[in-house]
């Protein structure tokens, strides 16, 4: 097995099975496109366990994804895909960048989920792009754009259902997709408090990486509490 890719939060390794990869979650935490970063022991374990539970839940709710199984506390086995260079963001409630970009008041609830595309390009700081940009860049065609948006909305509905069971609100989240050798689009990467904004329904307390971004609490304790809530649903 050899290292195929290393990002801010994960390492990806080849395996001895064609078409399958081993993903290892790291104890690194970053914010602001890496401007702020720290090592937090146990963070990788938490995100791996959370993502494994959520992807298994999505599988049972008919969302096609790359997850095969959890291998260890920090590792999982996934189907190999070619990652589409888009961060697909779904917003249910206004907060973060959209309040600065478009003037929405924090906490404003959108009548319908808003889906946005961000071009995965570190040197460009992952800019917001339109459907036409996606086509001009050769990232996806009209049919694929339609499919990505629908899959994102379907994921949103399933995650809202899951969060409701934990008395939490899904504010927004970002996901990534990839294509199999046969061209099928699958949900990939991770879904965790690193990639979602999650608020307590009663207190609006954050259960996500904003506690690190804004220095409002312990990231490890927050993620552990979220994992405990997930495990209590089993």
Curated annotation (Swiss-Prot):
GO terms for molecular function: ATP binding; phosphoribosylaminoimidazolesuccinocarboxamide synthase activity. Transmembrane segments: none annotated. It catalyses: 5-amino-1-(5-phospho-D-ribosyl)imidazole-4-carboxylate + L-aspartate + ATP = (2S)-2-[5-amino-1-(5-phospho-beta-D-ribosyl)imidazole-4-carboxamido]succinate + ADP + phosphate + 2 H(+). Keywords: ATP-binding, Ligase, Nucleotide-binding, Purine biosynthesis. Pathway: Purine metabolism; IMP biosynthesis via de novo pathway; 5-amino-1-(5-phospho-D-ribosyl)imidazole-4-carboxamide from 5-amino-1-(5-phospho-D-ribosyl)imidazole-4-carboxylate: step 1/2. PROSITE patterns: SAICAR_SYNTHETASE_1. GO terms for biological process: 'de novo' IMP biosynthetic process; cobalamin biosynthetic process. Its EC number is 6.3.2.6. Coiled coil: none annotated. SUPFAM superfamilies: SAICAR synthase-like (SSF56104). The keyword Ligase applies. It is an enzyme of class 6 (ligase). InterPro entries: SAICAR_synt/ADE2_N, SAICAR_synt_PurC, SAICAR_synth, SAICAR_synthetase, SAICAR_synthetase_CS. Belongs to the SAICAR synthetase family. This is Phosphoribosylaminoimidazole-succinocarboxamide synthase. It comes from Staphylococcus epidermidis (strain ATCC 35984 / DSM 28319 / BCRC 17069 / CCUG 31568 / BM 3577 / RP62A). The gene is purC.
